[in-house]
Amino acid sequence: MEGGSFGAGRAGAALDPVSFARRPQTLLRVASWVFSIAVFGPIVNEGYVNADSGPELRCVFNGNAGACRFGVALGLGAFLACSCFLLLDVRFQQISSVRDRRRAVLLDLGFSGLWSFLWFVGFCFLTNQWQRTAPGPGTAQAGDAARAVITFSFFSILSWVALTVKALQRFRLGTDMSLFATEQLGAGAGQTYPGYPVGSGVEGTDTYQSPPFTETLDTSPKGYQVPAY
């Protein structure tokens, strides 16, 4: 298994709940999670008020239903994303593949950057619509909720920008391949390869030599005499 990549511990290592809860990235996700509830919650509960001329409900932000829908979608999306990314952070050390870790970090980086931009757009849009809202009984009743939505939209910009920076830092850490190569070379340098074992029947460097003659061989047969002519 490949470990120690993208700012996480070695793959398969046990997760320390205390150190995980104290991580800046975890604290930022929890803060963003709370801010998202503080945005879409007031809009759902108090974001629609009675119009002065009739019983129909209108969005407190200048009667623009698109502003309320955008705020709810933005906050609800951030709420679900923070929940999913928190679970991903918990399981991140169990991911053994460096490629899968890289994809997870890229997903975090891309989504955090996108939501930072959307929070900025939402903050500007809601602020503009609130400034154009005409005063009235319904507006005065839901004024605190509208101001809370705008305030926590601004806080969400800061928290998501910080999450983007943390994801970028983790992506730049990448995989410490030099450390991985050093460990491999260190393990291979002290390893020796044994030769042929003694008594295995295989000779390494000895060459075959014919045994020396201990006596001169007589090629003529015994008992035979050459006849004389």
Curated annotation (Swiss-Prot):
- Where it mainly occurs, coarsely classed, is membrane
Topology in the lipid bilayer is annotated as: Multi-pass membrane protein
Q: Which domain of life is it from?
A: Eukaryota
The signal peptide stretch is: none
The UniProt record lists the keyword Membrane: yes
Task: State whether keyword tRNA processing applies.
Answer: no
PROSITE patterns in the record: MARVEL
Any one annotated GO CC term: neuromuscular junction
Q: Which residues form a coiled coil?
A: none
Residue positions of the PTM N-acetylmethionine?
1
> Which residues does the UniProt record annotate as the domain MARVEL?
20-172
What does the entry give for GO biological process?
positive regulation of transporter activity; regulated exocytosis
Localization of this protein: Cytoplasmic vesicle, Secretory vesicle, Synaptic vesicle membrane; Synapse
Keywords, comma-separated and alphabetical: Acetylation, Cytoplasmic vesicle, Membrane, Synapse, Transmembrane, Transmembrane helix
Q: Which residues cross the membrane?
A: 30-50, 70-90, 105-125, 148-168
**Protein function:** May play a role in regulated exocytosis. May indirectly regulate the activity of the plasma membrane dopamine transporter SLC6A3 and thereby regulate dopamine transport back from the synaptic cleft into the presynaptic terminal.
Family membership, please give it: Belongs to the synaptogyrin family.
* Self-association state and partner proteins as the record states: Interacts (via N-terminus) with SLC6A3 (via N-terminus). May interact with VMAT2.
Q: What is this protein called?
A: Synaptogyrin-3
The UniProt gene name for this protein comes to SYNGR3
